[in-house]
Amino acid sequence: MRNAALELFNDRLPHKPYFSDDLHFGVRIAGKERAILAKYIQFNQPHAMFWLGFDVDRIGAAIDWSDRNAPAPTLTITNPENGHAHLLYALETSIRTAPDGKMKPLRYAAAVENALRKKLGADTGYSGLICKNPNHSHWKIAVWQPELYTLDWLADSLDLNAANDKEIVADYGLGRNCTLFDKTRKWAYRAIRHGWPE
């Protein structure tokens, strides 16, 4: 049976993703053909985010998004042993995370991501680099939302003001990019004014 969400996941994988079969031994890089066989895999490109990913560490994580009035994830990838899950939201338009990316859309995406993380009660320590690989038979996968999300569509069901309060986690997800920019730009402006790099 054809699974459009899984096909989309595979199409959007990096050419050489990080992967692991056992996170205790770290991650490695290989071609997509090898990495796609592993239990864990890098799901976003190095400089573009096609998916918002969340790690929810509680029993029933794959279904309690509904009880929390959160938008339906595109995919849930559940550990059958403990019920913990990764929830992935497919974006219609990728978010440019490279150094040349524009800050305004990045800040908006970070606010949406943080608000959704809070609504889902997702792990703030999750780096978002790799996820449970939905291609691997160890995990249970479910497709909930077949349509691709826009940030505005996600934002419609979230309180972005609450997401930008004192609880915002500066080193979580896209917030890392914004924090890095804010911390380095002041130094860079001063350095350029003082004639750096000459």
Can you describe what each PLM-predicted range is?
Residues M1-A85, L91-R107, Y126:
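Signature for HUH/AEP ssDNA processing cores
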Residues I63, A110-E113, R117, F181-Y189:
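Generic detector of well-ordered alpha-helical segments enriched in charged/polar residues
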Residues A70, R117-G125, Y189, R193:
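Generic surface-pattern signal
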Residues A90, T124-D152:
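Short, conserved secondary-structure transition motifs
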Residues L91-I95, L151-E198:
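Modules that initiate DNA replication and primer synthesis
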Residues T93-D123, W153, S157-N164:
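Helical (often loop-to-helix) elements that flank the catalytic cores of nucleotide-handling enzymes
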Residues K119-C131, E167-Y172:
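Short secondary-structure transition/capping segments
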